[in-house]
């Protein structure tokens, strides 16, 4: 910079000096001129002035003159340039005006484009010299007309006497339509000399843009060589052209036929995009290379696009059929029309090569064509000969298209046009024809013999016997139905008559019947062929296009069902290759008098363009299925025992597509059975979300009322009830999603019914009649294997509504779909199918050319996704070890089910409020990760729910299921529907409590006895296994015992003022909000009722009877103090805060007191999820806000340990002991009763909230009069427990029991003197480890943390009295602790409090909802609840509740933000902002719940692909 400035200054000084010199010289020169004016000129010349050599200018100022001249020259040059430009502009304007273009198009052109088009115009005039003149053509036409007139034939309508008509607009339009493409003229250098205007319709590129351009700019680079070859001319040919004398005046032509990929800017929705982002479209260019005598050549061609088979809108004619091939051109789908045209049935061609069915002389051309198809994606064959089955051949032209799956070619679909009749019928061209012809002759003779037999009356006994044989040998009926179009061979009237004739003949054996059935379609093949020829001729001369079923509709329209008479959309047949038979027809329907059933399944399915193929109905399955049908019993039995078919054969429900190709050697339903656990990771919790956000239709469109097979199990009771059971379902409209029988083969296909009696009937039918169902359904579902449950995922790109919307009408047609239009998928561009589903699907999946297949969003809805599958499809995610334990527990439960038959009476009383609350769950089910396993329990669980109706009311509320996270017991939250969601929740909770306490003590007592017996049995089993596995499970026991016991510390121990802020560090790392966390929606239910501790040998029910009366008296005293109780349900992750209604609570508790006084029966702890209370997940503890009235008697010190975990098979998060059963888990939310819990850390609940001791002391006075907690044992345990329980979440992860001297804390002062009854391992105190950092930070060694896999909540190993070794680094290492497919997160201290949920996600998610929402919500809720009770409450409890109600608004939350970030990398959910919002924020239930936007939902669904 400095040097630059210096140079500028120096230049300025020089300029000044030069100016000064100039002025001096001018002055001196003027003086010299004046002084030397008298001197001679020689003197002036001889002695010039000093300045003269530099400027030989006079004093007249010539330097100024020079500058003026320069400026003038510049001005002149600028003027000249302007003039030239104006002249150029004028010339260009004149030139553009002379162009044969529209003025609007011309105005958009720049000069270069005008020159380009002008040159192209000149070349076009040159090109016309290559073509014979129109005048010559007219002369030829006139001569033809004159000769025709001379022959006195009919004069043609078209008069072509002058050129005027051909130059008119009408002729141009007719020419465009005749071309069926666009005209393209290329120079020998590849310049586009001419292109017709309609190129825009095919490629989206305008004529103006392409004229004069080079073809290389628009064609695919791999096709350039082929284009050059087509434009080139071999030397000998060129020389031959020059030598031929006639070429001097004429033209030589050479045919060209090539497939070129050209850029296409049109999208599937008709929009135009930029040329830079255009995709390629295969254009079939056919034309001639025109060469004149000078050697100049042009390629004059017509470009025709090859239609994609999914876009064919017009109905295919009877002489057009579809085939689908693998990449080696083996048939995988065969159109039924081939039987009429060529004599082939699908089984004749499946898995055979196309090249074995064509004439040998055409092999070379076919091979070249299909090589081009495989490389370019589309192609069209030349005319080739396709051999007939019995001899002869037809000429066929095929258009082939590759269908892609994720950019990988999957199959080849061919649209075949038959362009001739069957020629040379009696000539044999292959060995296959010879074999088929000989077989056909034999069958013809046998058919003639059978027709000669006299008709006999049908003997009922023979028919009955025949029925049995038909059931046992279902091959024959399936074979009849596997040939849906074989009866199309004769005319329909003859077909019906012959079918009646044959059906009424009573065959002696079933095999003879089968022979007759086989002979029927095969008989009279020559008549079939003649019929096909007649159809072709009739079609060629018909005024309009004939649909496929034209001949059937005209001949036998009376025999068709109403829906067959209605017009079908184009792709109907592919999605519906054959009308599915009724699910349970009478077995003798086909063979006996019901002839319509024999004819209807065989009616042609009105195929349109691509229907049968696009469904990818694997006809290869049919042959294998017929062999498997001989023994359908074995797989059916397997499926009835905890197995679920992932793909329902009837295509009903939300059956998703498989991404990988089918294993064609097995049947889908029998082999795709995966052993089920009794819960679904994600099933119905998104019903409400989908109903509001995503579904274009009402969610009730999935209802069983739209199907002939309803949700009721009564449908399967008798074969004749297939269509009559729908009106009898009272709850079918309520069970919109849960009860639709997505798979009739699945015995547990229905979720928790809203009507308990209906559910019980359904369960009985599902369990009692599985064998009859399997015998009846198995052959039928094999025939249904062509339905759309097997829809090719590739073809599905055009029908994305099949996946994105949950309407079952958009799937392939069920048996009783509303109408053919509803059942068949709409074509892309048909005018009557532009429905909401089409628009939605196009937005999601834009499909431009066949080279851009499905989006990456396609796998969202496949069966591996846990989000959108039906409940039956996803009960498969828990290891077999857990399932074995659960089966043992189920057997134990079934032993006691008979004792509780009387419980159903009260359940029926609760049906009406349950039915009123069906739609309640839609507002609460907004977490896509919560587990709703209670909606699809196993048969044992359903039966147990029905028997234990009083304890477990089977409510279909997803809220209960979400909160419980249970498999078999739903938390029934009953009441009238409130205005807000919070009120509904409150009412449901209150009625739940009321119902609990109203149920008879006998039921409670017997159930409690069952619990104790099961607990003791499980303890014995555990102890036996613990002796063997003690060494392996010590660490696991440490982890899990703390997991269990740390909850007890919340209630049992005095809240000391010794809480300190270093706890915040323990909370920082524990709660990585993961999919596994979202599974653990645990309902905390505090129970009023407690039972006395029972010794392990107390297996008999008598000890319970003794304590029942005492407990009842104590209960009555307590319930007078519980009228103002606040129940807060806090979910593990989305902290749903539900506020109780005070008045309803008072009324209910009064009713509870009255009933308990009347009945004098023992109330029991109601177990959520059956007896298995939702245990604590490692990633979530539940924060609890409750005022706990004190107990007054010693017998009230009930151990929550007594609650057995007998029914943990329905629970996702088992707190397992050695066998995973029987370990005590406290009921996590007990109804405002006092509990005596073996707990050791008094500050645990406070630590979860984290207030200072000073704050607790200041709040002590506020709560002094409400409750009293025992303070006697606190002082000796506070220091020890403050060290042990640094965080609840650490205790959950690193939970172990050390044998300890610490005593159990008793809540009552009176009970403090009483020693708790030793319960073995249940009575042992809890020992919490103190070193949090080593355990929490060492999350890499935790087997529960396994990357981004999608996992269920971890199942814990048991915590045993054998204690742990005290290692804080011990983690759960059971095999079943990490179920496959889920990701556990590294949780040190997973508290549910608002602290973690708000602060953890604050930095990671761009959540608009910050802490204030949850904090204010919970605070307001706490304020609304009356704080004071009649009972005294210690100071610490008040502080704890205020801490909870504060939602962590204190100093914890900001400080915990800092060390959370390292969790985010391992958490797959943190990558999706919508999911983070869902995980992060509390649901403000009073404000209408949480709602997704569409973008957020897509982001949630777009989380990383799960292995």
Curated annotation (Swiss-Prot):
Any Pfam family: bHLH_HIF1A
Composition bias type Polar residues, residue spans: 548-559, 706-717, 803-818, 1413-1423
Biased composition (Basic and acidic residues): 72-85, 439-459
Expression by tissue: Ubiquitously expressed in the embryo.
Main localization category: cytoplasm
Domain bHLH residues, every copy: 72-125
Induction: By hypoxia.
Start-end of Pro residues biased regions: 578-588
Gene Ontology CC terms: cytosol; nucleus; RNA polymerase II transcription regulator complex
Biased composition (Low complexity): 26-49, 718-745, 754-777, 823-832, 907-918, 926-951
Subunit structure: Efficient DNA binding requires dimerization with another bHLH protein. Interacts with Vhl.
Written domain comment of the UniProt record: The oxygen-dependent degradation (ODD) domain is required for cytoplasmic localization in normoxia.
Protein name (database record): Protein similar
Gene source species: Drosophila melanogaster (Fruit fly)
